[in-house]
Amino acid sequence: MIKEFLNKLADPIISFPLVTILFVLMYKYYRFVGTKKFLVWFSVISLAVFGWACTDPNFLAIILWPDNIPISILVVMLVYFQWLSLYKASINDQRIEAGDVPIEATPEEREKVWCWPNLVYTELFAIIGCTVFLVVWAIVFKAPLEEPANPTWAPNPAKAPWYFLGLQEMLVYFDPWMAGVVLPVLIIVGLMAMPYMDTNPKGNGYYTFAERKTAIFLWSYGWLVLWIFLIIVGTFLRGPNWTFYGPFEYWDFHKVVAENNVNLSEFFWIKWFNTALPSNIFVREFPGIVVSGVYQFVLPYAFMFTNKGKELIRGIGYIRYFILIFLALGMLSLPIKMVLRWLFSLKYLIAMPEFELNL
C-alpha cells in the first residue's frame, strides 16, 4: 500500500510540482532549514526511510546498479552542501541585521596562510585519498568497458551519461533541436552572462540569501529543479522504452502506457471549432505562433510597467533587462511545457514537420 502510494507520488506529474513547492518552502523558511537541529532530524528520518526502502528488491537493484551509485552519492552530497549554504547564509544574515559583519569578514577568517606547505599538502592528501577511493571502487563495483558498439543491437533502456540525462529527459517534451541544441546553448550563455547581469555588489565573498534573494532563487531553481531533478528522474525512474517506473516497481519490458498527445493546432481547429485543419501551414499554426509570440515578445514589455519591472530596469538598465528576461523565459519554457503535456497532453505549440520545426 505504502509502496504503491510512493510509486504514484514519484511520477513526474506529481513529483515535479511537489519538488517545486518544497523548493519554495526551503528558501522561504531557510533560517529554519539551515539549522543543525533540522539537519539531524532530516538525516535520521532519511536514513530510516532509505533503510526501509532497501528491503524492496526492485529499489535495491536500481540503487546498487554500478552506473547509478555515483548518482546516489551525488544526491547525498548535494543535499548536504545545499543545507550548508543555507546554514551559513542564515548565520550571516542574522549578523548583518544585528549590525555586525559576515563571518567571512572577521579577522580570524581573513587570516592568510602560505601556499607551501599548507595548500600543497592539502591537495596532495586529497589526490592520494581520491586515488585510493577510485581503485577500491574499480575493484568492488563491476563496471568494465564493454565490447565495441553493435549497430544491430541497442540497449533498452538506452541512456546517455548521467550528466546528459537532464537533456534526454527534456526530449520527452521538446524536439531534439530544442532539447539538444537551443536549451543547452541558453544554459551556457546564461551561465556566462550571469556575472555581467547582476549589478548587486552585496553578497560577494560571503554566504547570504537576504541580500541576493532573486538571483539565488532563480539560479537555484534552474539548477536543483530543472536540472538535478531531471537527472534523478532519468537515472532512477526511467526504464525500458523510456517509460516511467516507480522506485519500487519492477521494470517490465512489456509495459505499455497509452498516450494520445495533441498539437495546439488540433485543439484549436478540430476540438474547439469543429473543423478540419487548414491546408495553409501558417494559418494552421497561427494559434501557436500567436501564443509563442505573446510569451516571448509581449510579456517582457508588459512586465516593464509593473513595479518589479521598473525596479529591475532602474537597477540593471534596459539592455541587461531584456537579456535577463529572454533567458528567464527560456528557462521557464521547460516547466510550462511539462505542465501543458501533463494536464492537456499537449505535444507541440507549433507543429511544422514540413520545415522540421516543432516547438
Predicted stretch roles:
Residues 62:
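Conserved P-loop NTPase catalytic core
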